[in-house]
Amino acid sequence: MSEMTPREIVHELDRHIIGQDKAKRAVAIALRNRWRRMQLPEELRVEVTPKNILMIGPTGVGKTEIARRLAKLANAPFIKVEATKFTEVGYVGKEVETIIRDLTDVAVKMTHQQAMSKVQFRAEELAEDRILDILLPPARDQWGQNEENDTDSSTRQSFRKKLREGKLDDKEIEMDIAAPQMGVEIMAPPGMEDMTNQLQGMFQNLAGNTSKKRKMKIKDAIKAATEEEAAKLVNQEELKEQAIFSVENNGIVFLDEIDKICKRGDSSGPDVSREGVQRDLLPLVEGSTVSTKHGMVKTDHILFVASGAFQMSKPSDLIPELQGRLPIRVELEALTSHDFKRILTEPKASLTEQYKALMATESVNIDFSEDGINKIADAAWQVNERTENIGARRLHTVMERLMEELSFDATDRSDELLIIDEAYVNERLDELVENEDLSRFIL
């Protein structure tokens, strides 16, 4: 779990996301509170519940990007789901409990990788011993016991040194390797994923763990043997317990597009993918126990971060019980022309840097002048104002249109230096930006 301070988290988010300081502060505090809670005594820790967050803001202002970056910083089980993918229990489709099951799968995978990295050094030593036993079979006495003398030991150490230096990598040997488990693909209708997983596990268990002799290069043999030895050193039952503990105490669920499951005033009758989903989410957010293939998972201390544009609805259209379970509200601001300029230049992997790198692969060097960047930002902002406001995503459309000709001709323009300035941008975008009808269909 991440031990970064709120200031460090915000600083890290600033490297990738422009503006939206309120939202960054809210998620930074929420993430730090996860760590603070784990420092409390057991009896008090149980009482401290997470303060779930609702992020409200127009499309393309950074809600989903904050979630993506948070997942990398959290170092905790994290899953991002679209609220629109679920239906009410009893109807065809995915039910909301699959969120927790998927989160548990993520935690098991994370815990497994961490455990494997801890035993990596020991596993490599055991793998080397297996390879050396094949290269230098130990001498046996008359009773079949292994004999070891000083000469054998020094020869073994000499071979071990060569093995580590990679001098034997291309030599071929034959060794026993666990046969890969047969993957059984079962097609099932939506909502039947649990049954599918159980059947797949049953078929894999029937196959059993078999090994077979394979001829391979020593370089590949060491890799395969290391994975096998590491798996033997890891206790799978302990892993599952650690993963469930991690989900229950550090798990984070990001619910995107929550505004799309608000009940609209003009609709009548049951709405199984809207209000029904909200009702099903209530016990998860409030705290309940979900059955997974790894064990029972309590959701009392899982942090939920919901987000939505709320263009066709408003937060008060959510059912009151769900509103109460999302106590922290953060409003994200619409992006201005100045924000667009910063988005094009400040982030670590900004759009301009991406296009420079892509063109450099064709030996075409491009550079963006300051007035060129200003013009691109203005063009994107103007199109947003005149047509639909899709936020920073408009920059992708404008940039792709601007670079289309160069991308097509790049192979014929090797070793050329091209400055993209205001005149270059005007030549390619002016007509589209000024003509509202063209903007609607092309940008």
Swiss-Prot record:
Q: Does the keyword Ubl conjugation apply?
A: no
Job of this protein: ATPase subunit of a proteasome-like degradation complex; this subunit has chaperone activity. The binding of ATP and its subsequent hydrolysis by HslU are essential for unfolding of protein substrates subsequently hydrolyzed by HslV. HslU recognizes the N-terminal part of its protein substrates and unfolds these before they are guided to HslV for hydrolysis.
Where is the protein localized?
Cytoplasm
Q: Which UniProt keywords apply?
A: ATP-binding, Chaperone, Cytoplasm, Nucleotide-binding
Q: Which InterPro entries match?
A: AAA+_ATPase, ATP-dep_Clp_protease_ClpX, ATPase_AAA_core, Clp_ATPase_C, HslU, P-loop_NTPase
Tell me the NCBIfam families matching this sequence: hslU, PRK05201.1
| GO biological process terms on file | protein unfolding; proteolysis involved in protein catabolic process
Family per record: Belongs to the ClpX chaperone family. HslU subfamily.
Against Pfam families, the record matches this protein to: AAA, AAA_2
SMART domains recorded: AAA (SM00382), ClpB_D2-small (SM01086)
For this record, the Gene Ontology CC terms, alphabetical, are: HslUV protease complex
Name this protein carries in UniProt: ATP-dependent protease ATPase subunit HslU
Parts of the chain that traverse the membrane: none
Describe the protein's quaternary organization and the partners it interacts with.
A double ring-shaped homohexamer of HslV is capped on each side by a ring-shaped HslU homohexamer. The assembly of the HslU/HslV complex is dependent on binding of ATP.
From which source organism is this entry? Photobacterium profundum (strain SS9)
Region (Disordered) location: 141-165
**Predominant location:** cytoplasm
Q: Which GO terms describe its molecular function?
A: ATP binding; ATP hydrolysis activity; peptidase activity; proteasome-activating activity
Q: Which residues bind ATP?
A: I18, G60, V61, G62, K63, T64, E65, D256, E321, R393
